[in-house]
Design a protein with these regions (language model features):
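Membrane-embedded translocation segments of transport machinery
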Residues: 261-272, 277-345, 408
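N-terminal alpha-helical transmembrane segments of multi-pass membrane transport
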Residues: 2-121, 131-138, 149, 497-538
Length: 538
């Protein structure tokens, strides 16, 4: 069973979806670059996405590592993703915020900034692959993995705020670069601990920077161009050829550049509007299909539950469904990778645990809601294309085109859905590029220092690669950056294990504050950070 090892696409989807320059000078450049990176990407990918045998079925060890961490933290923190859900929603609404709290953006803006980096093509294409390879039962295991990932996200994002750096200009920097450097040195006093912390932080910065340029940038630009080209007639349409791809790439670069120049405040303002918009567009499409087939919903849920524990018709049976579901969810919500704390650390708060609580909503939105809606839509539609794809994979191991599977489900009710899908892909891609531009900028600053010149140099490089990604595919480069990002999970989770007691103390400190008269009488604030009009006291 091939692992699903692209954050925003499955193995085999890159050739099916991303079509760079096919001939001429650009095609030659692409071939040469891919030839250089291919052996590196293959070797690193074989290690990072290597499989261990589970009842005779291959299970990517990096997925097992991520899922195990989620399970351990769930027990250690007493199922905080369940017990703390109501409090997380209160914090998100600004219930425990003050206007003068240190930071740059509100809890809501931090959440939408991070969600925009995780919700992407994986929720459209990746889920289509998962339910084709793992059957409807893979949906159940996706949800379970998402619930476990909520706790990992709580831990890493609390640490992101706890160890963030405050700069003289009022900005902050947080994430694995900070909590690995400071936290490891704190937990392991002495020169060895300080050295280890610096090395781990530098490695984290390099890994985040590389993926930010690859999967978080070039791949998104490429998919946007391909989707726009397909919906306008493909090779016979007005946007066929490298020239149109170049123009679209420049337009994307201008849009992203305009947003990221404003920093995290600008990113927060944009994502706080863009993320709800793209969620509404996509979820509405799912709901329309579900409502048109409302009588089939009980049977669909029955198929999901029975498939989870019987694995009927799935290669590998129950274990096969479990592996595919866990893999898709782990690679979709990024819980434990260390990327999301960069966005969450910019929040305005005096209590790091507040943002950890808000952050645990992220895997819930990404996996439990969006991925489940996609899977339910596919299962309910039960298209011939999906059934043929399942049979073809079971018989021949044929690569699955996840976008086609998902799109076919929508087309049963909405023949014009490719247009909606194009809008969703563009929104997902732009929001992902914006967020990963910020992640990469923080990694760049950690490696090369903070200055206006350095910042502008990075932004120029990032936007240039948007244009390059729109025209060229560089499949091997993207595979390499994917492997690098998930390698970060190895060192990040080691850091989370070491620093889990710090998170427990921060949670206790916040809960103690909640019992104080000052906190109980706190004037509620809305998502914008300002007091809600209905709650203002005379």
């Amino acid at each position: 069973m091939p692992p699903i090892h692209h954050l925003h696409a499955a193995p085999g989807e890159l050739p099916a979806l991303a079509q760079g320059a096919q001939s001429g000078f650009l095609g030659t450049v692409e071939e040469k670059i891919n030839a250089i990176f291919d052996p590196i990407a293959t070797g690193l990918g074989d290690f990072v996405f290597g499989e261990v045998s589970l009842f005779g079925i291959g299970f990517p060890w990096i997925v097992a590592w991520l899922v195990l961490a989620g399970a351990v933290f769930t027990v250690y923190f007493g199922f905080i993703q369940v017990r703390g859900l109501r409090l997380a929603l209160q914090v998100l609404r600004g219930r425990h915020s003050r206007k003068g709290d240190p930071g740059e953006i509100t809890h809501f803006q931090a959440l939408t900034s991070a969600v925009s980096g995780t919700v992407g093509l994986g929720n459209i294409a990746g889920v289509g692959v998962a339910v084709t390879i793992g059957g409807a039962g893979a949906t159940f295991w996706m949800v379970l993995c998402g619930l476990l990932g909520m706790c990992s996200k709580f831990v890493e994002c609390t640490l992101g705020v706890r160890y963030r750096d405050h700069h003289p200009d009022g900005t902050v920097s947080g994430g694995p670069m900070q909590y690995l450097r400071k936290g490891v040195a704190e937990r392991l006093p002495g020169p060895a601990g300080r050295f280890l912390g610096r090395v781990l932080a530098a490695l984290a910065a390099v890994m985040i920077l590389l993926f930010g340029i690859g999967g978080g940038n070039m791949f998104q630009a490429n998919q946007t161009v391909i989707q726009i080209r397909d919906v306008t007639g493909g090779d016979d349409g007005p946007l066929a050829g490298d020239g149109s791809a170049l123009v679209l790439g420049v337009l994307l670069a201008l849009v992203v550049g305009f947003v990221i120049i404003g920093g995290i405040r600008s990113i927060g303002r944009v994502t706080s509007r863009l993320v709800p918009a793209m969620a509404i567009v996509y979820v509405t499409g799912c709901l329309i299909v579900i409502l048109f087939n409302i009588t089939d919903v009980p049977a669909a849920f029955g198929e999901i539950l029975s498939g989870a524990f019987t694995g009927e018709g799935v290669v590998g049976g129950t274990i096969g469904a479990l592996i595919v579901g866990f893999t898709r969810a782990a690679f979709s919500n990024e819980a434990g990778l260390g990327s999301a704390p960069i966005a969450h650390s910019a929040v305005k708060t005096r209590y790091p645990a507040t943002e950890g609580l808000v952050a645990l909503l992220e895997p819930f939105i990404d996996t439990v809601v969006v991925c489940t809606m996609t899977a339910l839509t596919i299962v309910i539609a039960d298209t011939r294309l999906w059934n043929d794809a399942k049979a073809d994979y079971a018989a021949n191991g044929t690569t699955v085109d996840g976008v086609t599977v998902t799109s076919s489900a929508f087309e049963t009710v909405l023949p014009w859905f490719p247009v909606v899908l194009t809008v969703a892909v563009v929104l997902f891609a732009v929001s992902t590029m914006i967020t990963w531009a910020y992640y990469g900028q923080k990694a760049w600053a950690h490696l090369f220092g903070r200055s206006k010149l350095s910042e502008r140099a990075y932004q120029t490089v990032f936007c240039t690669f948007i244009v390059i990604g729109a025209v060229l595919t560089f499949g091997s480069v993207l595979a390499f950056t994917d492997a690098v990002l998930f390698l970060l999970a190895l060192i990040n989770i080691i850091g989370l294990y070491l620093l889990a007691p710090v998170v427990k103390r921060e949670l206790a400190r916040f809960r103690t504050a909640l019992r104080s008269p000052e906190e109980r009488d706190r004037e509620p604030a809305g998502p914008s950070g300002e007091p809600e009009a209905a709650d203002r006291r005379a």
